């Protein structure tokens, strides 16, 4: 009886909560409920932390050079497209970079922003292959808690962003992230091409700097919410989540920077059998 009552309460809570969702995305892929993505992400975590390593335990690592080159440069092109769309749907066509609220209209620009937000959300599922490639190549040391957490939490939280607040100042971090990913995955693409291209990877340290700048800009931009008394952004809870996430990764990357470049400890080699070792977000 108690379980039945709890279930009923949960269903009522969900119904009351979901009624405020954006109807424009109701019938889009993966957007009807959070359950499909939760199942996908659960299977991803199970595969990369348990099933995959067990299946590969007595097997040789897969040779995935061509697949990784194709994958990385595809992400570069996809990120260029998403960055352009974020600019054209708001960030370069009217947003103030201050209190930019969500436009829930059916206008072409508003719908372009919604579509771009969904593309960004979907791209996070494509990026799960980062970890799958690690597992298939038996690079299990790179499948860290932080890596898996990041690749799981990004699509899961972005579902709520697209469902309720596709646009406005909560998308600035996505604009920056797509721009950074253009550079990052270009770097990984060169890495995947083998040792012959190592001479073109002298700018690895600057890649870390770029990621640090990304988190600083995200934190500063979102931090404006505390100083804008009349900002009527519809879902401020999302801004607090973004700011918390930005601060956490800013601290993690500062620690990485200090350990790698200031304290004098040696970094892992940029290339190992033609493959990169690097943090990326």
Swiss-Prot record:
One of its GO terms (molecular function) is fatty acid elongase activity. It is a multi-pass membrane protein. The keyword Transmembrane helix applies. The active site is at 150 (nucleophile). The keyword Nucleus does not apply. Catalyzes the first and rate-limiting reaction of the four reactions that constitute the long-chain fatty acids elongation cycle. This endoplasmic reticulum-bound enzymatic process allows the addition of 2 carbons to the chain of long- and very long-chain fatty acids (VLCFAs) per cycle. Condensing enzyme with higher activity toward C18 acyl-CoAs, especially C18:3(n-3) acyl-CoAs and C18:3(n-6)-CoAs. Also active toward C20:4-, C18:0-, C18:1-, C18:2- and C16:0-CoAs, and weakly toward C20:0-CoA. Little or no activity toward C22:0-, C24:0-, or C26:0-CoAs. A motif (Di-lysine motif) lies at residues 277-281. Pathway: Lipid metabolism; fatty acid biosynthesis. Belongs to the ELO family. ELOVL7 subfamily. One of its GO terms (biological process) is fatty acid elongation, monounsaturated fatty acid. It comes from Rattus norvegicus (Rat). InterPro entries: ELO_CS, ELO_fam, ELOVL7. A motif (HxxHH motif) lies at residues 147-151. It holds the Pfam family ELO. Homodimer. Interacts with TECR. The C-terminal di-lysine motif may confer endoplasmic reticulum localization. It comes from the Eukaryota. The modification N-acetylalanine is found at residue 2. Residues 2-27, 94-115, 163-176, 228-236 are lumenal. The chain crosses the membrane at residues 28-48, 73-93, 116-136, 143-162, 177-197, 207-227, 237-257. This is Very long chain fatty acid elongase 7. It is found in: Endoplasmic reticulum membrane. Residues 49-72, 137-142, 198-206, 258-281 are cytoplasmic. It catalyses: a very-long-chain acyl-CoA + malonyl-CoA + H(+) = a very-long-chain 3-oxoacyl-CoA + CO2 + CoA; eicosanoyl-CoA + malonyl-CoA + H(+) = 3-oxodocosanoyl-CoA + CO2 + CoA; (5Z,8Z,11Z,14Z)-eicosatetraenoyl-CoA + malonyl-CoA + H(+) = (7Z,10Z,13Z,16Z)-3-oxodocosatetraenoyl-CoA + CO2 + CoA; (6Z,9Z,12Z)-octadecatrienoyl-CoA + malonyl-CoA + H(+) = (8Z,11Z,14Z)-3-oxoeicosatrienoyl-CoA + CO2 + CoA.
